[in-house]
Amino acid sequence: MTRPDSGSSPAPLSEARRRKRNPLPTVLGITALLGLAGFIAFGNLNKSLEYFVTPTEYQQQAAQLKGRPVRIGGLVKAVKYNPQSLELSFTVTDGGASFPVRYRGAVSDLFKENQGVVVRGEFEGQTFQARELIVKHSEQYDVPKTQAELRDLLEQSE
């Protein structure tokens, strides 16, 4: 059975109605994800920082830095080194405060009294237990030009 042709085409179907979405859940979701990423990236950053301080600064901030890894810089005094056991003990000072330091490991030939040093580690009681020892030195190196200068350099290194 066919329909009689009425001579006109059927009316076009109305466009599908678009559903209007509320942007609030999307904005809240993105904000939550950014907040979580920021917390993961920076939340524990303060705990992992290692501060560089002088002995006097450490003495003033001891309560805040207690139990945290720090780097202490100063001058070396009273060196005792056992090359067989690689045990090194010395005092680091900035002229105001001093701390005893213990370190186990190989020591640079540049390490000596009155030399600048940076030690990295933590305090155990009143003694600083260093895990890393960095000796400061001059950036300039002049090759001895005469035999006398070479002799003087060798004598100073002993």
Curated annotation (Swiss-Prot):
GO terms for biological process: cytochrome complex assembly. The lineage of its organism: Bacteria, Thermotogati, Deinococcota, Deinococci, Deinococcales. This is Cytochrome c-type biogenesis protein CcmE. GO terms for molecular function: heme binding; metal ion binding. It comes from the Bacteria. Heme binds at H137, Y141. Belongs to the CcmE/CycJ family. Residues 1-23 are cytoplasmic. Signal peptide: none annotated. It comes from Deinococcus deserti (strain DSM 17065 / CIP 109153 / LMG 22923 / VCD115). One of its GO terms (cellular component) is plasma membrane. Residues 1-11 have a biased composition (Polar residues). Residues 45-158 are extracellular. It is found in: Cell membrane. Keywords: Cell membrane, Cytochrome c-type biogenesis, Heme, Iron, Membrane, Metal-binding, Signal-anchor, Transmembrane, Transmembrane helix.
